[in-house]
Amino acid sequence: MAVTGGGRPAARQQAARGKQMQRTFNNVKITLICGFITLLVLRGTVGINLLTYGVGGGGGSDAVAAAEEARVVEDIERILREIRSDTDDDDDDEEEEPLGVDASTTTTTNSTTTTATAARRRSSNHTYTLGPKVTRWNAKRRQWLSRNPGFPSRDARGKPRILLVTGSQPAPCDDAAGDHYLLKATKNKIDYCRIHGIEIVHSMAHLDRELAGYWAKLPLLRRLMLSHPEVEWVWWMDSDALFTDMAFELPLARYDTSNLVIHGYPELLFAKRSWIALNTGSFLLRNCQWSLELLDAWAPMGPKGRVRDEAGKVLTASLTGRPAFEADDQSALIHILLTQKERWMDKVYVEDKYFLHGFWAGLVDKYEEMMERHHPGLGDERWPFVTHFVGCKPCGGYGDYPRERCLGGMERAFNFADNQVLRLYGFRHRSLASARVRRVANRTDNPLVNKEAALKMDAKIES
Protein backbone atom coordinates (compact mmCIF):
# COMPACT_ATOMS: atom_id res chain seq x y z
CA MET A 1 0.00 0.00 0.00
CA ALA A 2 1.30 3.38 -0.97
CA VAL A 3 0.16 5.18 2.15
CA THR A 4 2.90 5.95 4.64
CA GLY A 5 2.83 7.66 7.97
CA GLY A 6 5.10 10.49 9.13
CA GLY A 7 8.54 9.86 10.64
CA ARG A 8 7.85 6.59 12.36
CA PRO A 9 9.80 4.45 9.83
CA ALA A 10 12.91 6.59 10.49
CA ALA A 11 12.45 6.07 14.22
CA ARG A 12 12.23 2.31 13.68
CA GLN A 13 15.46 2.38 11.62
CA GLN A 14 17.19 4.34 14.37
CA ALA A 15 15.99 1.78 16.93
CA ALA A 16 17.31 -1.05 14.75
CA ARG A 17 20.70 0.68 14.45
CA GLY A 18 20.82 1.10 18.22
CA LYS A 19 20.16 -2.59 18.73
CA GLN A 20 22.84 -3.48 16.16
CA MET A 21 25.40 -1.31 17.96
CA GLN A 22 24.48 -2.94 21.28
CA ARG A 23 24.95 -6.42 19.84
CA THR A 24 28.31 -5.38 18.33
CA PHE A 25 29.44 -4.05 21.71
CA ASN A 26 28.37 -7.30 23.38
CA ASN A 27 30.33 -9.32 20.81
CA VAL A 28 33.45 -7.22 21.50
CA LYS A 29 33.07 -7.85 25.22
CA ILE A 30 32.74 -11.58 24.64
CA THR A 31 35.87 -11.55 22.44
CA LEU A 32 37.92 -9.74 25.09
CA ILE A 33 36.73 -12.06 27.83
CA CYS A 34 37.51 -15.14 25.74
CA GLY A 35 41.00 -13.73 25.16
CA PHE A 36 41.43 -13.25 28.90
CA ILE A 37 40.36 -16.84 29.55
CA THR A 38 42.88 -18.02 26.97
CA LEU A 39 45.57 -16.05 28.79
CA LEU A 40 44.67 -17.78 32.06
CA VAL A 41 44.88 -21.19 30.44
CA LEU A 42 48.26 -20.41 28.92
CA ARG A 43 49.51 -19.17 32.28
CA GLY A 44 48.70 -22.53 33.81
CA THR A 45 50.22 -24.60 31.03
CA VAL A 46 53.42 -22.84 29.96
CA GLY A 47 54.52 -21.32 33.26
CA ILE A 48 53.44 -17.71 32.93
CA ASN A 49 52.29 -17.98 36.55
CA LEU A 50 55.96 -17.90 37.52
CA LEU A 51 55.99 -14.20 36.70
CA THR A 52 53.25 -13.57 39.21
CA TYR A 53 53.76 -16.00 42.08
CA GLY A 54 57.58 -16.45 42.08
CA VAL A 55 59.86 -19.25 41.07
CA GLY A 56 59.75 -21.15 44.33
CA GLY A 57 55.99 -21.48 44.20
CA GLY A 58 55.20 -23.13 47.51
CA GLY A 59 51.90 -24.78 48.35
CA GLY A 60 50.48 -21.56 49.80
CA SER A 61 51.17 -19.68 46.61
CA ASP A 62 49.48 -22.43 44.58
CA ALA A 63 46.38 -22.22 46.78
CA VAL A 64 46.21 -18.45 46.40
CA ALA A 65 46.61 -18.76 42.65
CA ALA A 66 43.88 -21.39 42.43
CA ALA A 67 41.50 -19.25 44.48
CA GLU A 68 42.26 -16.21 42.35
CA GLU A 69 41.65 -18.16 39.15
CA ALA A 70 38.37 -19.55 40.51
CA ARG A 71 37.20 -16.03 41.38
CA VAL A 72 38.13 -14.74 37.94
CA VAL A 73 36.35 -17.62 36.20
CA GLU A 74 33.25 -17.04 38.32
CA ASP A 75 33.25 -13.35 37.38
CA ILE A 76 33.66 -14.22 33.73
CA GLU A 77 30.76 -16.68 33.81
CA ARG A 78 28.57 -14.09 35.54
CA ILE A 79 29.38 -11.45 32.89
CA LEU A 80 28.70 -13.94 30.11
CA ARG A 81 25.30 -14.77 31.62
CA GLU A 82 24.42 -11.07 31.75
CA ILE A 83 25.50 -10.55 28.15
CA ARG A 84 23.45 -13.52 26.98
CA SER A 85 20.46 -12.20 28.91
CA ASP A 86 20.80 -8.76 27.28
CA THR A 87 21.07 -10.34 23.84
CA ASP A 88 17.98 -12.50 24.43
CA ASP A 89 15.98 -9.42 25.43
CA ASP A 90 16.99 -7.66 22.21
CA ASP A 91 15.94 -10.68 20.17
CA ASP A 92 12.58 -10.80 21.97
CA ASP A 93 12.02 -7.15 21.12
CA GLU A 94 12.53 -7.90 17.46
CA GLU A 95 10.23 -10.92 17.52
CA GLU A 96 7.44 -9.20 19.44
CA GLU A 97 7.54 -5.96 17.48
CA PRO A 98 4.41 -5.83 15.29
CA LEU A 99 4.46 -5.19 11.57
CA GLY A 100 2.70 -1.83 11.86
CA VAL A 101 4.30 1.25 13.33
CA ASP A 102 1.09 2.04 15.19
CA ALA A 103 1.39 -0.94 17.49
CA SER A 104 4.49 0.20 19.38
CA THR A 105 5.49 3.15 21.48
CA THR A 106 8.90 4.62 20.57
CA THR A 107 10.57 7.22 22.79
CA THR A 108 13.62 9.22 21.65
CA THR A 109 15.86 10.95 24.21
CA ASN A 110 19.27 12.45 23.31
CA SER A 111 19.36 10.45 20.06
CA THR A 112 18.74 7.15 21.89
CA THR A 113 15.66 5.28 20.66
CA THR A 114 13.98 2.61 22.77
CA THR A 115 11.11 0.42 21.62
CA ALA A 116 8.93 -0.55 24.57
CA THR A 117 6.48 -2.89 22.87
CA ALA A 118 7.86 -6.21 24.04
CA ALA A 119 8.29 -5.10 27.64
CA ARG A 120 4.71 -3.84 27.76
CA ARG A 121 3.31 -7.01 26.26
CA ARG A 122 5.23 -9.18 28.72
CA SER A 123 3.56 -7.32 31.56
CA SER A 124 0.51 -9.11 32.93
CA ASN A 125 -1.18 -5.75 33.52
CA HIS A 126 -0.66 -4.53 29.95
CA THR A 127 -3.70 -3.29 28.03
CA TYR A 128 -3.19 -3.49 24.29
CA THR A 129 -3.03 -0.19 22.42
CA LEU A 130 -2.91 0.71 18.74
CA GLY A 131 -0.02 3.09 19.32
CA PRO A 132 1.03 6.26 21.12
CA LYS A 133 -1.93 8.23 22.41
CA VAL A 134 -2.87 11.10 20.12
CA THR A 135 -4.24 14.25 21.75
CA ARG A 136 -5.75 17.47 20.41
CA TRP A 137 -6.13 15.92 16.96
CA ASN A 138 -8.97 18.26 15.97
CA ALA A 139 -6.84 21.35 16.61
CA LYS A 140 -3.75 19.83 14.98
CA ARG A 141 -5.77 18.83 11.94
CA ARG A 142 -7.30 22.30 11.57
CA GLN A 143 -3.86 23.84 11.80
CA TRP A 144 -2.47 21.46 9.18
CA LEU A 145 -5.35 22.21 6.79
CA SER A 146 -4.81 25.95 7.17
CA ARG A 147 -1.12 25.54 6.34
CA ASN A 148 -1.76 23.23 3.38
CA PRO A 149 -4.49 24.77 1.23
CA GLY A 150 -3.55 22.40 -1.58
CA PHE A 151 -5.15 19.58 0.43
CA PRO A 152 -8.70 20.80 1.10
CA SER A 153 -11.08 18.77 3.25
CA ARG A 154 -13.83 19.22 0.64
CA ASP A 155 -13.88 17.89 -2.90
CA ALA A 156 -14.45 19.81 -6.14
CA ARG A 157 -18.21 19.66 -5.59
CA GLY A 158 -17.92 21.20 -2.14
CA LYS A 159 -18.72 17.98 -0.31
CA PRO A 160 -16.69 16.53 2.58
CA ARG A 161 -13.79 14.48 1.29
CA ILE A 162 -14.28 10.72 1.73
CA LEU A 163 -11.70 7.95 1.67
CA LEU A 164 -13.12 4.48 1.00
CA VAL A 165 -10.96 1.78 2.59
CA THR A 166 -11.10 -1.92 1.85
CA GLY A 167 -8.64 -4.77 2.01
CA SER A 168 -7.87 -8.41 1.42
CA GLN A 169 -5.38 -10.94 2.70
CA PRO A 170 -1.75 -10.74 1.52
CA ALA A 171 -1.69 -14.33 0.28
CA PRO A 172 -3.67 -15.74 -2.66
CA CYS A 173 -7.08 -17.27 -2.05
CA ASP A 174 -7.50 -21.01 -1.75
CA ASP A 175 -8.55 -21.17 -5.40
CA ALA A 176 -8.59 -18.90 -8.43
CA ALA A 177 -12.35 -18.31 -8.22
CA GLY A 178 -11.93 -16.54 -4.88
CA ASP A 179 -9.32 -14.17 -6.30
CA HIS A 180 -11.51 -13.58 -9.36
CA TYR A 181 -14.52 -12.49 -7.33
CA LEU A 182 -12.43 -10.35 -4.99
CA LEU A 183 -11.10 -8.62 -8.10
CA LYS A 184 -14.66 -8.04 -9.29
CA ALA A 185 -15.60 -6.63 -5.89
CA THR A 186 -12.64 -4.25 -6.05
CA LYS A 187 -13.55 -3.17 -9.58
CA ASN A 188 -17.09 -2.51 -8.36
CA LYS A 189 -15.80 -0.23 -5.59
CA ILE A 190 -13.52 1.62 -8.00
CA ASP A 191 -16.49 2.25 -10.32
CA TYR A 192 -18.60 3.71 -7.52
CA CYS A 193 -15.76 5.89 -6.24
CA ARG A 194 -14.98 7.16 -9.74
CA ILE A 195 -18.62 8.13 -10.32
CA HIS A 196 -18.94 9.95 -6.99
CA GLY A 197 -15.50 11.53 -6.61
CA ILE A 198 -14.38 9.36 -3.70
CA GLU A 199 -10.78 8.29 -3.11
CA ILE A 200 -10.09 4.62 -2.47
CA VAL A 201 -7.39 2.60 -0.71
CA HIS A 202 -7.15 -1.18 -1.02
CA SER A 203 -4.80 -2.64 1.57
CA MET A 204 -3.19 -6.07 1.38
CA ALA A 205 -0.88 -5.55 4.36
CA HIS A 206 -1.34 -6.61 7.97
CA LEU A 207 -0.14 -3.55 9.87
CA ASP A 208 -0.25 -5.32 13.22
CA ARG A 209 0.32 -9.06 13.61
CA GLU A 210 -1.69 -9.02 16.86
CA LEU A 211 -4.82 -7.78 15.10
CA ALA A 212 -5.43 -10.32 12.36
CA GLY A 213 -8.70 -11.38 10.80
CA TYR A 214 -11.73 -9.25 11.66
CA TRP A 215 -9.55 -6.85 13.62
CA ALA A 216 -7.09 -5.90 10.89
CA LYS A 217 -9.19 -2.88 9.91
CA LEU A 218 -8.57 -1.02 13.19
CA PRO A 219 -4.83 -0.22 12.86
CA LEU A 220 -5.35 0.48 9.15
CA LEU A 221 -8.13 3.00 9.79
CA ARG A 222 -6.12 4.73 12.50
CA ARG A 223 -3.03 5.01 10.31
CA LEU A 224 -5.03 6.40 7.38
CA MET A 225 -6.79 8.97 9.56
CA LEU A 226 -3.48 10.25 10.89
CA SER A 227 -1.78 10.14 7.48
CA HIS A 228 -4.60 11.91 5.63
CA PRO A 229 -5.77 14.89 7.70
CA GLU A 230 -7.37 16.28 4.53
CA VAL A 231 -9.96 13.46 4.62
CA GLU A 232 -13.15 14.24 6.55
CA TRP A 233 -14.67 10.75 6.53
CA VAL A 234 -12.97 7.34 6.41
CA TRP A 235 -15.36 4.70 5.09
CA TRP A 236 -14.58 1.05 5.77
CA MET A 237 -16.10 -1.57 3.47
CA ASP A 238 -15.45 -5.32 3.61
CA SER A 239 -13.95 -6.99 0.56
CA ASP A 240 -17.05 -9.18 0.13
CA ALA A 241 -19.45 -6.21 -0.02
CA LEU A 242 -20.53 -4.70 -3.35
CA PHE A 243 -22.23 -1.45 -4.31
CA THR A 244 -25.49 -2.33 -6.05
CA ASP A 245 -26.98 1.16 -6.32
CA MET A 246 -24.47 3.18 -8.28
CA ALA A 247 -26.67 6.30 -8.23
CA PHE A 248 -27.19 6.54 -4.47
CA GLU A 249 -25.14 9.14 -2.58
CA LEU A 250 -24.51 9.23 1.13
CA PRO A 251 -26.74 11.81 2.86
CA LEU A 252 -23.78 13.40 4.64
CA ALA A 253 -25.76 16.41 5.81
CA ARG A 254 -27.72 14.01 8.01
CA TYR A 255 -24.53 13.21 9.91
CA ASP A 256 -23.33 16.74 10.70
CA THR A 257 -23.37 16.05 14.45
CA SER A 258 -22.26 12.40 14.25
CA ASN A 259 -18.83 10.81 14.18
CA LEU A 260 -19.73 7.16 13.54
CA VAL A 261 -22.32 6.07 10.97
CA ILE A 262 -23.15 2.38 10.98
CA HIS A 263 -26.01 0.28 9.65
CA GLY A 264 -28.15 -1.33 12.31
CA TYR A 265 -31.41 -1.61 14.17
CA PRO A 266 -31.83 0.48 17.35
CA GLU A 267 -34.46 -1.86 18.79
CA LEU A 268 -32.19 -4.88 18.44
CA LEU A 269 -29.34 -2.89 19.93
CA PHE A 270 -30.92 -1.46 23.04
CA ALA A 271 -33.96 -3.63 23.77
CA LYS A 272 -32.55 -7.04 22.84
CA ARG A 273 -28.78 -6.53 23.06
CA SER A 274 -28.45 -8.60 19.89
CA TRP A 275 -25.00 -9.43 18.58
CA ILE A 276 -26.21 -8.64 15.04
CA ALA A 277 -27.81 -5.29 15.93
CA LEU A 278 -24.98 -3.50 14.06
CA ASN A 279 -22.78 -4.54 11.16
CA THR A 280 -19.16 -3.45 10.89
CA GLY A 281 -18.85 -4.56 7.28
CA SER A 282 -19.61 -1.01 6.12
CA PHE A 283 -19.35 2.06 8.34
CA LEU A 284 -18.06 5.64 8.33
CA LEU A 285 -15.74 7.29 10.86
CA ARG A 286 -15.19 11.02 10.99
CA ASN A 287 -11.52 11.98 11.08
CA CYS A 288 -11.49 13.48 14.59
CA GLN A 289 -10.26 13.01 18.15
CA TRP A 290 -13.46 11.20 19.15
CA SER A 291 -12.90 8.52 16.51
CA LEU A 292 -9.28 7.97 17.55
CA GLU A 293 -10.42 7.47 21.13
CA LEU A 294 -13.12 5.04 20.01
CA LEU A 295 -10.52 2.98 18.15
CA ASP A 296 -8.36 2.99 21.30
CA ALA A 297 -11.31 1.72 23.35
CA TRP A 298 -12.23 -0.83 20.70
CA ALA A 299 -8.84 -2.49 20.19
CA PRO A 300 -8.00 -4.13 23.59
CA MET A 301 -10.24 -7.16 22.92
CA GLY A 302 -8.52 -7.83 19.60
CA PRO A 303 -5.02 -9.27 20.23
CA LYS A 304 -4.96 -12.88 19.09
CA GLY A 305 -4.54 -15.66 21.59
CA ARG A 306 -5.66 -15.73 25.19
CA VAL A 307 -6.87 -12.10 25.25
CA ARG A 308 -9.19 -12.62 22.29
CA ASP A 309 -10.42 -15.98 23.61
CA GLU A 310 -11.26 -14.60 27.05
CA ALA A 311 -12.91 -11.52 25.55
CA GLY A 312 -15.04 -13.83 23.41
CA LYS A 313 -16.45 -15.42 26.55
CA VAL A 314 -17.36 -11.99 27.91
CA LEU A 315 -19.10 -11.02 24.66
CA THR A 316 -21.03 -14.29 24.46
CA ALA A 317 -22.30 -13.75 28.00
CA SER A 318 -23.16 -10.10 27.30
CA LEU A 319 -24.90 -10.27 23.90
CA THR A 320 -28.05 -12.14 22.93
CA GLY A 321 -27.70 -14.95 20.42
CA ARG A 322 -23.93 -14.81 20.12
CA PRO A 323 -22.27 -18.22 19.65
CA ALA A 324 -19.23 -19.14 21.71
CA PHE A 325 -16.16 -18.11 19.73
CA GLU A 326 -13.27 -15.68 20.02
CA ALA A 327 -13.91 -11.95 20.20
CA ASP A 328 -14.83 -10.28 16.92
CA ASP A 329 -14.79 -6.57 16.14
CA GLN A 330 -18.55 -6.30 15.60
CA SER A 331 -19.52 -7.82 18.95
CA ALA A 332 -16.84 -5.77 20.71
CA LEU A 333 -18.21 -2.52 19.28
CA ILE A 334 -21.77 -3.39 20.29
CA HIS A 335 -20.56 -4.27 23.79
CA ILE A 336 -18.72 -0.96 24.11
CA LEU A 337 -21.71 1.09 22.95
CA LEU A 338 -24.01 -0.72 25.38
CA THR A 339 -21.75 -0.66 28.44
CA GLN A 340 -20.45 2.88 27.82
CA LYS A 341 -23.55 4.38 26.28
CA GLU A 342 -23.11 7.82 27.88
CA ARG A 343 -19.56 8.04 26.59
CA TRP A 344 -20.20 7.21 22.94
CA MET A 345 -23.79 7.03 21.73
CA ASP A 346 -24.37 10.78 21.37
CA LYS A 347 -22.05 10.75 18.36
CA VAL A 348 -23.23 7.44 16.83
CA TYR A 349 -25.79 7.41 14.03
CA VAL A 350 -27.44 4.00 13.63
CA GLU A 351 -28.58 4.11 10.01
CA ASP A 352 -31.67 2.08 9.10
CA LYS A 353 -33.21 4.22 6.34
CA TYR A 354 -31.12 2.69 3.55
CA PHE A 355 -28.88 -0.34 3.11
CA LEU A 356 -25.41 0.80 4.11
CA HIS A 357 -25.22 -2.95 4.66
CA GLY A 358 -27.69 -5.27 2.95
CA PHE A 359 -27.68 -9.00 3.67
CA TRP A 360 -27.23 -10.75 0.34
CA ALA A 361 -29.40 -13.84 0.82
CA GLY A 362 -32.65 -11.88 0.69
CA LEU A 363 -31.61 -9.61 -2.19
CA VAL A 364 -29.76 -11.36 -5.01
CA ASP A 365 -32.79 -13.27 -6.32
CA LYS A 366 -34.94 -10.13 -6.51
CA TYR A 367 -32.80 -7.99 -8.81
CA GLU A 368 -34.98 -8.60 -11.89
CA GLU A 369 -38.07 -7.61 -9.93
CA MET A 370 -36.31 -4.46 -8.73
CA MET A 371 -35.42 -3.50 -12.31
CA GLU A 372 -39.02 -4.08 -13.37
CA ARG A 373 -40.61 -2.00 -10.61
CA HIS A 374 -38.04 0.53 -9.38
CA HIS A 375 -34.96 2.53 -10.36
CA PRO A 376 -31.47 3.28 -8.99
CA GLY A 377 -30.96 5.98 -6.39
CA LEU A 378 -33.28 4.62 -3.69
CA GLY A 379 -30.70 2.71 -1.65
CA ASP A 380 -33.22 0.73 0.41
CA GLU A 381 -34.93 -2.62 -0.04
CA ARG A 382 -36.34 -1.41 -3.37
CA TRP A 383 -32.84 -0.99 -4.80
CA PRO A 384 -30.18 -1.84 -2.18
CA PHE A 385 -27.22 0.48 -1.84
CA VAL A 386 -24.82 -2.26 -0.66
CA THR A 387 -25.13 -6.02 -0.95
CA HIS A 388 -22.91 -7.71 1.60
CA PHE A 389 -22.04 -11.40 1.28
CA VAL A 390 -21.80 -12.12 4.99
CA GLY A 391 -20.90 -15.73 5.74
CA CYS A 392 -19.67 -16.53 2.23
CA LYS A 393 -15.89 -16.12 2.59
CA PRO A 394 -15.12 -16.28 -1.15
CA CYS A 395 -11.38 -16.42 -0.44
CA GLY A 396 -11.61 -19.46 1.84
CA GLY A 397 -13.39 -22.78 2.03
CA TYR A 398 -15.20 -22.47 5.35
CA GLY A 399 -18.23 -20.29 4.64
CA ASP A 400 -21.65 -20.68 6.22
CA TYR A 401 -23.37 -21.12 2.84
CA PRO A 402 -22.76 -23.39 -0.17
CA ARG A 403 -19.90 -22.02 -2.22
CA GLU A 404 -21.77 -22.29 -5.51
CA ARG A 405 -24.66 -20.25 -4.14
CA CYS A 406 -22.31 -17.56 -2.82
CA LEU A 407 -20.33 -17.21 -6.04
CA GLY A 408 -23.50 -17.23 -8.11
CA GLY A 409 -24.95 -14.49 -5.93
CA MET A 410 -21.78 -12.42 -6.24
CA GLU A 411 -21.92 -12.76 -10.02
CA ARG A 412 -25.50 -11.52 -10.08
CA ALA A 413 -24.75 -8.61 -7.73
CA PHE A 414 -21.72 -7.54 -9.76
CA ASN A 415 -23.59 -7.64 -13.08
CA PHE A 416 -26.59 -5.86 -11.55
CA ALA A 417 -24.29 -2.99 -10.57
CA ASP A 418 -22.19 -3.20 -13.72
CA ASN A 419 -25.27 -2.68 -15.90
CA GLN A 420 -25.67 0.74 -14.28
CA VAL A 421 -22.09 1.58 -15.30
CA LEU A 422 -22.22 0.07 -18.80
CA ARG A 423 -25.38 2.04 -19.58
CA LEU A 424 -23.18 5.12 -20.07
CA TYR A 425 -21.51 3.33 -23.00
CA GLY A 426 -24.64 1.73 -24.47
CA PHE A 427 -24.07 -1.83 -23.23
CA ARG A 428 -25.49 -4.25 -20.68
CA HIS A 429 -24.98 -7.85 -19.60
CA ARG A 430 -26.93 -10.47 -21.51
CA SER A 431 -28.26 -11.66 -18.15
CA LEU A 432 -27.34 -11.16 -14.52
CA ALA A 433 -25.73 -14.60 -14.57
CA SER A 434 -23.55 -13.85 -17.60
CA ALA A 435 -20.33 -11.89 -17.95
CA ARG A 436 -21.04 -11.36 -21.67
CA VAL A 437 -22.46 -8.00 -22.75
CA ARG A 438 -24.55 -6.77 -25.67
CA ARG A 439 -25.14 -3.37 -27.23
CA VAL A 440 -28.44 -1.71 -26.33
CA ALA A 441 -27.88 1.81 -27.65
CA ASN A 442 -25.58 3.69 -30.00
CA ARG A 443 -23.90 6.34 -27.85
CA THR A 444 -21.55 7.57 -30.59
CA ASP A 445 -23.94 9.17 -33.10
CA ASN A 446 -24.55 12.21 -30.87
CA PRO A 447 -22.19 11.57 -27.97
CA LEU A 448 -22.64 14.73 -25.89
CA VAL A 449 -26.43 14.60 -25.92
CA ASN A 450 -26.39 10.89 -25.23
CA LYS A 451 -23.91 11.42 -22.40
CA GLU A 452 -26.26 13.86 -20.66
CA ALA A 453 -29.01 11.25 -20.80
CA ALA A 454 -26.73 8.45 -19.64
CA LEU A 455 -25.45 10.50 -16.70
CA LYS A 456 -28.90 10.40 -15.16
CA MET A 457 -27.84 7.51 -13.00
CA ASP A 458 -31.20 7.26 -11.27
CA ALA A 459 -33.14 6.70 -14.50
CA LYS A 460 -35.05 3.45 -14.82
CA ILE A 461 -33.12 0.53 -16.29
CA GLU A 462 -34.94 -1.61 -18.82
CA SER A 463 -35.12 -5.23 -17.74
UniProtKB/Swiss-Prot annotation:
Pfam families: Glyco_transf_34 (PF05637)
Ranges in the topological domain labelled Lumenal: 48-463
Entry's localization field: Golgi apparatus membrane
Biased composition (Low complexity): 9-20, 103-118
Domain of life according to the entry: Eukaryota
EC number: 2.4.-.-
TM annotation in the entry: 25-47
Glycosylation sites: 110, 125, 442
Residues in compartment: Cytoplasmic: 1-24
GO cellular component: endosome; Golgi membrane; trans-Golgi network
Keywords annotated in UniProt: Glycoprotein, Glycosyltransferase, Golgi apparatus, Membrane, Signal-anchor, Transferase, Transmembrane, Transmembrane helix
UniProt-annotated stretches for the region Disordered: 1-20, 82-125
One GO term (biological process): xyloglucan biosynthetic process
Keyword Glycosyltransferase: yes
Signal sequence residues: none
Membrane topology (UniProt): Single-pass type II membrane protein
Single GO MF descriptor: hexosyltransferase activity
Gene3D superfamilies: Spore Coat Polysaccharide Biosynthesis Protein SpsA, Chain A
Biased composition (Acidic residues): 87-99
Function: Probable glycosyltransferase that may be involved in the biosynthesis of xyloglucan.
Family that this chain belongs to: Belongs to the glycosyltransferase 34 family.
Protein name: Probable glycosyltransferase 3
UniProt gene name: GT3
